[in-house]
Amino acid sequence: MYIPDSYLDELIASDIPSGIDLTTHVLGIGAQPGRMEYYTRDAALLCGTEEAARIFGRFGCTVAEALPSGSMLAPGDVFMTVEGPAAGLHMGWKICLNIFEYYCALATKARQMVDAVHAVNPLCEVLSTRKLMPGTKPFDVKALTLGGAFPHRLGLSETVLVFDHHLTFYGG
C-alpha cells in the first residue's frame, strides 16, 4: 500500500513546525555525518520502512540498508540503517521511530489474530472496522493488511451499509 507524500509531509510538519531541530542547531552539530540503526527488542512484523526512507530522504539522508515491510523480525534484528547529516538524522529519528513502534505492533497483533483464527477455521477472515484514530488510516490499513487482516470498509463511498439512524430519516 502506498502512503502519499502529503501524509508524510503532515507528519513532518507536526513534529518540526519550524523546519529545524533546535537542539542540533544550538549545539552546532547539524552538518556532522552520522549513521543510525533501527532494531527491534521483540519479535515483530515490520511495517513502515518504505515511508521512513522517504521521510529521511527529505532531510538529506540515505538508507544504507532496509528490510521491506512485511518482514518477520527476531529480537535484536537491525531492520534499517540510515546515513546522513546529524540534523537530518535527528529530524527523521523520532517520526520514524513512532511509525515503527505503533505500526509494527499493529501488524504483529493483526498477524497473531489471523493465525489464531485460521488455526480454528482456515476459511474465516479477520476484518477491521472504520473505527480508527483520526488521521491514522493510511498506516492503520497498511499495518492491518500486512498482518493478514482485511479492511471491512475503507470509507462511506465504497459500499451501502444501512444503520438504524439512516432508517429514522427514511421513514421507518
List where the protein language model places each region.
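Acidic/glycine-rich phosphate/pyrophosphate-binding loops and surrounding catalytic core
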Residues: 1-172
